[in-house]
């Protein structure tokens, strides 16, 4: 098996619930590294397709372009489809990106919108959704996931000063920026939140989904 593996090779991971009405989740990425983990086992480390935001560098000088046009050109340079850009439509007389990653260029553009025009982009995020790349303060389109006591909620740790964390049984299909309704009767807690971080864990000790919500500490 190891002989057939190569770095940057396409990878697809599929997991979910079997049986009638089962829900499945397909994750796509590329091989970052691999090494033996036992006599008949290979450990493969893979990264998501959004890695292109960090691997792609840009050098651009733009004049008199609206911010959303600049953002679309930056995101499109990754080779990934661009689904939606929802940012203030300010026009920059001149803006330069000098051999920086796309992620860094987007941060530079966001900082310019905040510093030069006084906009608050603290709720905005960049993510790769079902239809492509988003830069928006909205949510990923799709159904609202429900996590609740006596059904699938394992633990819930609200943190008013930082990132709150809820752990549930596995939730195939849940991705960044999807809406989640958390009902924790033990804490008398019921809120509709935006998933700022999603970690699916599959293992011999059980399958869980960890959801970070309520605070976005930044990226890139």
Predicted features, each with a name:
Residues 59-60:
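Glycine-rich loop/hinge motif
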Residues 41-53, 78, 82-156:
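Short beta-strand-centered interaction patches in the first periplasmic/extracellular domains
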Residues 1-51, 162-164, 194, 198, ...:
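Assembly/oligomerization scaffold segments
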Residues 28, 68-72, 103-107:
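Extracytoplasmic/secreted envelope proteins and their assembly/folding machinery
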Residues 36-37, 67-83:
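Glycine-rich, acidic and aromatic/proline-enriched surface loops and short helix-turn segments
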